Amino acid sequence: MANKMTMKIARLNITLILTLVGVGVWAQGPNNSGTYYQNANGKKGEALKTAMYNIIKNPDVVSYSGLIDAYQKTDTRPDGYVRDWYSNVTNFRHNTDKAGNYKKEGDVYNREHSIPQSWFSKASPMKSDIVHVVPTDGYVNNRRSDYPFGEVGKVEYQSTGGYSKLGPCRTSGYSGKVFEPNDEIKGDMARIYFYMATCYEDKIAGWSGEIITGTKYQPYSTWQFDMLMRWSEQDPVDSVEIARNNAVYEVQGNRNPFVDYPGLENYVWGTKKVNAFSYNNYDVDTNGIDDMQQEMTPAPDIITTLYGVRVNSHHLSPGIYIRNGKKYLVR
């Protein structure tokens, strides 16, 4: 009897060990992130932000000159040209059309600091952190200067087709000049700003700039922060942004959690900050995106990927698509 009991206990122990090992092996975060975010599990609000900081801090950034080569991984359109964040009429060739002399939109592309480098005194690693240093048309970038992002009232300058704009801010709380990126990248920029507030939690309070408040937890002016939260909701994470985030991980070894976990900003600063974060069982926030069926026969409209490639609508894989100019989610 004793031997049987011992064997039974042993089997139970082995089963328990295998169960625990199985949990450890199979618990995975989104976008092939594995257990990258595991140390943030169970955290809330400010503690969650600090946990994310400890995970993504100290990126192994490339040199400033090395960004040009790195853009071939992070910012290449399906047709092989550079993805330009400020203009949609350019066809820049990687390396060939890089920063140089320019007189007009479409001449060259260069490296744009979404958070102007003058705000952090051109210090490293922020200066070449590819999460926020993106390729843009050189002329349009120059017009942006170091103005904060915002929503323009009276337009003083706009790129071709009004893709990007510059002028006095129309948002309550600020009347200075702002640069307004296109609607299709406003969410991307918002999530970059959330990343910068998190990855550089130990530094950002010491930065200058009209929207920097000198605080660690939520470092942006109220009007700016509220706008960024709205931008992130109105322009949700898409497959282009996810692909870029994965490429960034290959380049500098860290990720943007606000891309991997859509709506994470609400868990850090917003209405869900009292809720515990779960890295492998996350309640994805798809506010702003309507659902669409996988099967659509016959197809009533032209449906494309976020890159503009038309797809067969008879069986859509899970993801985000564009239908009649609006984003839809297939679960």
Model region roles, listed by residue range:
Residues A2-I14:
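Bacterial N-terminal signal peptides that target proteins for export
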Residues G22-G24:
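N-terminal signal peptide c-region/cleavage motif recognized by signal peptidases
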Residues W26-F92, Y267-N275:
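N-terminal module-boundary/linker segments of secreted carbohydrate-active enzymes
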Residues N88-V108:
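Short, His- and charge-rich active-site/binding loops that engage polyanionic ligands
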Residues N101-N110, S114-D285:
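Domain-level detector of nuclease and nuclease-like folds
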Residues F277-V309:
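Residue-level detector of functionally pivotal "anchor" positions at catalytic/ligand-binding pockets or at interdomain
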